[in-house]
Regions:
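Compact, charge-rich alpha-helical regulatory domains located at protein termini
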Residues: 2-77
Length: 77
């Protein structure tokens, strides 16, 4: 059985993207286009959480959670 991939929304975008590189593609498709730039991921990504980014970008958190769930992730916190 495959290990469940878990995204903890209390962690920084940088931590999540480091653990699961495919998260960058999912988030980029949702409108977080800066995430694919290493400089942005290494600076803002270390301070930003997905819920904070969702508020800034005005993307419903439910949309983001649905996209992760469809990609096989479990979302917590």
């Amino acid at each position: 059985m495959m290990e469940k991939k878990t995204i903890d929304l209390s962690k920084s975008v940088f931590e999540i993207a480091s653990a699961y590189p495919e998260v960058k593609d999912i988030m980029s498709e949702l409108g977080f286009t800066e995430i694919v730039k290493p400089s942005m991921l290494n600076t803002m990504g270390k301070m930003m959480t997905i819920p904070k980014g969702a508020r800034v970008k005005e993307i419903p958190l439910s949309t983001i959670i649905d996209a992760f769930t469809l990609s096989g992730f479990e979302v917590i916190n």
